[in-house]
């Protein structure tokens, strides 16, 4: 008995000319978004065949999801990770192909440390790619079977969870042609799109940071070079020479930031 053909996965779609066109741009954006995020643990949820963390320098990097090849096999809606244990979360096209994107974002907020960051990639509904999806052409195939999420909508979701967008970009303005030669002929639209219609890129990559209420960085207000010495607690010394040397060292001390955590409530705000 013949088996019905299986639907192409998103990972397989990225191997097509159209998918490779998108992936080339997204790889550069992921590299730029994660290379300056520091910490100890970073996790990519979904699409293990695409290493979105390759430019990140954290010592512990792993993938999580239901697909073969993930470091941690788990439902993307329920992560077997401790709360406040991760410094960076990357979601490559996970939200638009899941029935409960809100739950995924809640899990991201839960596992992220305060000031941890989240990077999200998605298809833009306000683009030629979004137009093709609305026309219903090949709606059952990737990526058209997904629920494209607009940037304003995503921003509101993140804001409700306490995340704060801090970076992002849209790209890939050419029509979603299936053949590479046509995508190359419309390559001129990349520079034109960045300049004239930047909100109409076919895909986006954004970064947000998790903020926590009651937490703020406080730096002393130094008015002059002697303020550092005055800020240090006085210590009784019998030897005046030692005391003078200590004061001189205090004037050369660098300003230190103090982290003040107030309140017992749990909150969050992410940066992107």
Where are these regions (language model features)?
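Conserved catalytic loop of SAM-dependent methyltransferase domains
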Residues: 165-190, 199-200
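A short acidic, Gly/Pro-enriched loop at the edge of an enzyme's catalytic core
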Residues: 77-89
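A short glycine-rich, Lys/Arg-flanked "PGG" loop and its adjoining helix->strand segment in the class I
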Residues: 102-117
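Conserved class I S-adenosyl-L-methionine
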Residues: 117-145
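A short SAM/SAH-binding and catalytic strip from SAM-dependent methyltransferases
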Residues: 87-102
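C-terminal lobe and adjacent flexible extensions of AdoMet/dcAdoMet transferase-like proteins
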Residues: 188-272
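Short alpha-helix
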Residues: 135, 145-168
């Amino acid at each position: 008995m013949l088996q019905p053909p299986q639907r192409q996965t998103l990972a397989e779609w990225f191997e097509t000319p159209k998918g490779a066109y998108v992936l080339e741009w997204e790889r550069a954006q992921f590299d730029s978004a994660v290379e300056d995020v520091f910490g100890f643990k970073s996790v990519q949820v979904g699409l293990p065949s695409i290493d979105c963390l390759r430019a990140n320098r954290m010592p512990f990097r792993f993938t999580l999801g239901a697909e073969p090849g993930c470091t941690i096999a788990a439902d993307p809606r329920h992560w077997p990770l401790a709360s406040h244990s991760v410094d960076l979360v990357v979601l490559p096209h996970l939200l638009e192909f899941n029935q409960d994107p809100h739950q995924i974002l809640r899990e991201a907020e839960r596992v992220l440390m305060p000031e941890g960051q989240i990077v999200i990639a998605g298809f833009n509904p306000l683009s030629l790619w979004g137009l093709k999806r609305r026309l219903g052409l090949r709606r059952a195939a990737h990526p058209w079977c997904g629920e494209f999420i607009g940037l304003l909508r995503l921003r509101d979701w993140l804001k409700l969870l306490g995340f704060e967008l801090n970076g992002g970009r849209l790209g890939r303005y050419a029509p979603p042609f299936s053949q590479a030669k046509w995508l190359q002929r419309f390559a001129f639209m990349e520079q034109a799109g960045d300049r004239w219609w930047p909100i109409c890129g076919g895909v986006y990559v954004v970064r947000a940071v998790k903020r926590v209420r009651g937490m703020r960085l406080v730096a002393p207000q130094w008015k002059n070079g002697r303020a550092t010495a005055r800020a240090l607690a006085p210590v009784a010394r019998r030897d005046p020479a030692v005391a003078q040397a200590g004061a001189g060292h205090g004037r050369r001390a660098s300003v230190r930031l103090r982290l003040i955590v107030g309140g017992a409530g749990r909150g969050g705000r992410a940066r992107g």
